[in-house]
Curated annotation (Swiss-Prot):
Activates long-chain fatty acids (LCFA) by esterification of the fatty acids into metabolically active CoA-thioesters for subsequent degradation or incorporation into phospholipids. Also facilitates the transport of LCFAs into the cell, either by active transport or by decreasing the intracellular LCFA concentration. Contributes, with FAA1, to the activation of imported myristate. Also involved in long-chain base (LCB) uptake. In contrast ot LCFA uptake, LCB uptake does not require ATP, suggesting that the enzyme is directly involved in LCB uptake. PROSITE patterns: AMP_BINDING. It comes from Saccharomyces cerevisiae (strain ATCC 204508 / S288c) (Baker's yeast). This is Long-chain-fatty-acid--CoA ligase 4. Its main location: other. PANTHER family: ACYL-COA SYNTHETASE LONG-CHAIN, ISOFORM J, LONG-CHAIN-FATTY-ACID--COA LIGASE. Interacts with FAT1. Residues 1-21 are annotated as: Disordered. The gene is FAA4. It is found in: Lipid droplet. It catalyses: a long-chain fatty acid + ATP + CoA = a long-chain fatty acyl-CoA + AMP + diphosphate; (9Z)-hexadecenoate + ATP + CoA = (9Z)-hexadecenoyl-CoA + AMP + diphosphate; (9Z)-octadecenoate + ATP + CoA = (9Z)-octadecenoyl-CoA + AMP + diphosphate; hexadecanoate + ATP + CoA = hexadecanoyl-CoA + AMP + diphosphate.
Amino acid sequence: MTEQYSVAVGEAANEHETAPRRNIRVKDQPLIRPINSSASTLYEFALECFTKGGKRDGMAWRDIIDIHETKKTIVKRVDGKDKPIEKTWLYYELTPYITMTYEEMICVMHDIGRGLIKIGVKPNGENKFHIFASTSHKWMKTFLGCMSQGIPVVTAYDTLGESGLIHSMVETDSVAIFTDNQLLSKLAVPLKTAKNVKFVIHNEPIDPSDKRQNGKLYKAAKDAVDKIKEVRPDIKIYSFDEIIEIGKKAKDEVELHFPKPEDPACIMYTSGSTGTPKGVVLTHYNIVAGIGGVGHNVIGWIGPTDRIIAFLPLAHIFELTFEFEAFYWNGILGYANVKTLTPTSTRNCQGDLMEFKPTVMVGVAAVWETVRKGILAKINELPGWSQTLFWTVYALKERNIPCSGLLSGLIFKRIREATGGNLRFILNGGSAISIDAQKFLSNLLCPMLIGYGLTEGVANACVLEPEHFDYGIAGDLVGTITAKLVDVEDLGYFAKNNQGELLFKGAPICSEYYKNPEETAAAFTDDGWFRTGDIAEWTPKGQVKIIDRKKNLVKTLNGEYIALEKLESIYRSNPYVQNICVYADENKVKPVGIVVPNLGHLSKLAIELGIMVPGEDVESYIHEKKLQDAVCKDMLSTAKSQGLNGIELLCGIVFFEEEWTPENGLVTSAQKLKRRDILAAVKPDVERVYKENT
């Protein structure tokens, strides 16, 4: 009999659902907190971890010494004519990593909490505190300070637009907001509406002696503060350092106000890929349990000697949970930035990966595909004999042939050094990744674990346990969750086939969306099961495999369904594809791929096809049909090699000239596609492709 990693706990309620299942190690009782912890609130948990960590370094970060500007002129084809366009590239000069011990983190947590109370923020849930900032040590310290006073935190992505920011600030009646200096300019308009906000705290001093980027950082922040004061002269503005100093001086007069397990710790707004963001109310009980669930699946594998690098948005539950896991492991958490992970955008210093040398790295599919394609580009630049040697050793490693470990250590050494040289585990979460990408990075760098979860469950659902390592699955149920599958009859998924919509129960699951009873009612069954909206199946070993989201399954003209996210994860693994949105018209048989091309690989192809000569800018030739057809042909080869066929094969592609970023509103901060907006931008081109292939 096949070994089982989850077991049924009870009988199926009816023929339209499977029996509920749990991780086999918690079959009798799911966890409600981390193993070996007695904490019931996030404050208790942080204090417990920091006390245990003592004089060990718990947190590390880099400060910006300067930002260097370089202007370049590129030629771009506009309306059929070549037009010179000037672009500015920014390069960051950073300090080495600065560290703080766990003991010092206790002091800072309390100082910030007392500082907030002293300036007028009320404790014990009476006021809410908004964080609108990029991931940094100051983001986390501010969050911890709020926890020490029972102040619920409202999170918003640093890329959130004005309407979303106003919605989250007004709906929650937040009285204070922490932000980055460079985001202050985004506050003036929202603060006209959000009259409830009385305090603004910015992450760095606004100092006229700050000459970084030729004084632009100071001037931009100063102008933004002046604008805020103009529209809201009643608002009090402080720097992060000022709050700490105020808190230190108030040590003997401001008490700590401890939260209760059932108190809201965080109202986390979903990224809003299809509409107005919903505020997920997560209690201290929920989040502490969530940390326990994820930690359960890797216990004994990650610990105090590990170095965990942090760069994903902290406004995303995936990152917030894993940073608290780092405290639980008593490792050191090193803050980084997507722009400076590699030396590509740094000056006079190493990139964050080479400087910090992490052993554990958490990322999303878009990050890992970028890493993979960057490695492939470097391999393709090698002489022919070197490429042959590389792929020969890779094939040996993939087949676990004796001595392949020694050979791969020598051949892959330089590639591994680009990520710091010490990685033991990498983790993908947030969205699906192709099996090809998981295999490639697992063999080249270290094992890639897979995580799956939702904001509503504190990222708890599945984490692939290292001893159960496999490809193409979402992983093992975490230690806090009970799960079952229910029929989705109209899509052809039935529990009798071990397929259906995935439903959860457990301590991490939230109980409501903030001030949104309609969405809350729709998300839960009458008997309290949370509907994930994801279609899944039980594997023969009792692990979970995600097929797609219900809303991303589209019925085509012949009546069959295609799974958009599944297709995107596979086509995205093609070297010519940086990102892709698969669009399926219900009145057509096959889908169209809307593709953001990988310009480096595309440039090489254009030269090989004789479309351009070396030195020219491939962006000028992006609409050449010969180039698009060649890329589409290669993408179809990728699809067929990974098992796609029939209606899953694209009938054609459209190139999208602009990268999809949260700033231009084409993806969320969690890198989820805003499908309607992407399609709207290229609808005539998509219709042309369909017409040509009908």
